């Protein structure tokens, strides 16, 4: 059995760790509220854009934007992967990466090659380590990212699709469901899909000023950017929720461990006292 001093040292070490996990839990609880507000503010715009683009995909026009055209064969696909910059978020990032690898293997089994761009330090490090072809990367965007910071990596994928270097583009991120649930999501970005709402079967006629090509070029690009930005906000909220839950679990485990160590310490102290008493009694009897 370890000595009382060693056990006391272990208890002190676990208590110090508990202070850190409690602090991180409280910080994440505070940040998640702000992240949820940002996410909710952005959602209506993204949803309205999605509905409008779905209608444009069915509109009667002489000009068909490249983002609406499905390539005949799928030989190469691209993923925009969003992760966190920091760890201590439970299995949030690893679960996402595991699902991406499963999807990638399915495509590769069909002879389809895969390119990615990464948003977030964890994704960048992970995919560089396993030697996936990375077309672009951006990291350390913080808790309040700006759209301008994402435009570069988004443009890489849009240009590759327009030039037919990629045949499909997917957006991969953690969708925020609630504080306890975050879901790995795979959304098809390109080619754009037609609307599936109750008016999807209508034929839509739009008047474009100055012309269809100019309007659609701007609208389509803004739409893709809004989807990626919304996914980024969802992932940030998911990160803080996962970290809060993980740190609470760590704090609870620390409490249990401290309780167990305290019992061991009490038993060791009791055994030491009992031994001292026995030695005193034995010495007195010998006299």
Curated annotation (Swiss-Prot):
InterPro entries in the cross-refs: ATP_synth_F1_ATPase_gsu (IPR035968), ATP_synth_F1_gsu (IPR000131), ATP_synth_F1_gsu_CS (IPR023632)
CDD domains assigned to the protein according to its UniProt record, in alphabetical order: F1-ATPase_gamma (cd12151)
One Pfam family here: ATP-synt
Family indicated by similarity: Belongs to the ATPase gamma chain family.
Protein's GO biological process: proton motive force-driven plasma membrane ATP synthesis
MF term (GO), any: proton-transporting ATP synthase activity, rotational mechanism
Signal peptide from the UniProt entry: none
Protein name (record): ATP synthase gamma chain
Presence of keyword Nucleus: no
Superkingdom, taxonomy of origin: Bacteria
Subunit composition and interactions: F-type ATPases have 2 components, CF(1) - the catalytic core - and CF(0) - the membrane proton channel. CF(1) has five subunits: alpha(3), beta(3), gamma(1), delta(1), epsilon(1). CF(0) has three main subunits: a, b and c.
Localization (cell): Cell inner membrane
Gene Ontology, cellular component aspect: plasma membrane; proton-transporting ATP synthase complex
Keywords: ATP synthesis, Cell inner membrane, Cell membrane, CF(1), Hydrogen ion transport, Ion transport, Membrane, Transport
């Amino acid at each position: 059995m370890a000595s009382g001093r060693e056990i006391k040292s272990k208890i002190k070490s676990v208590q110090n760790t508990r202070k850190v996990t409690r602090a991180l839990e409280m910080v994440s609880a505070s940040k998640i509220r702000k992240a949820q507000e940002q996410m909710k503010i952005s959602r209506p715009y993204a949803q309205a854009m999605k509905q409008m683009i779905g209608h444009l995909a069915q509109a009667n026009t002489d000009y068909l934007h490249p983002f609406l055209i499905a390539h005949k064969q799928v030989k190469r696909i691209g993923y925009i992967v969003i992760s966190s910059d920091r760890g201590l978020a439970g299995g949030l990032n690893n679960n996402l990466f595991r699902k991406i690898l499963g999807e990638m293997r399915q495509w590769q089994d069909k002879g389809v090659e895969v390119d990615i761009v990464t948003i977030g330090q964890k994704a960048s490090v992970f995919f560089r380590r396993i030697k996936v072809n990375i077309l672009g990367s951006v990291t350390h965007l913080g808790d309040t990212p700006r759209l301008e910071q994402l435009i570069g990596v988004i443009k890489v994928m849009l240009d590759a699709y327009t030039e037919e270097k990629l045949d499909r583009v997917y957006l991969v991120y953690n969708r925020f469901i609630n504080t306890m649930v975050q879901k790995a999501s795979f959304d098809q970005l390109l080619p754009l899909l037609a609307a599936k709402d109750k008016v999807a079967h209508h034929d839509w006629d739009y008047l474009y000023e100055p012309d269809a090509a100019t309007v659609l070029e701007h609208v389509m690009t803004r739409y893709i950017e809004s989807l990626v930005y919304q996914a980024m906000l969802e992932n940030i909220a998911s990160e803080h929720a996962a970290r809060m839950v993980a740190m609470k679990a760590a704090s609870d485990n620390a409490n249990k461990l401290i309780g167990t160590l305290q019992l061991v310490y009490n038993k060791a102290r009791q055994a030491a006292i009992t031994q001292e008493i026995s030695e005193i009694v034995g010495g007195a009897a010998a006299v």
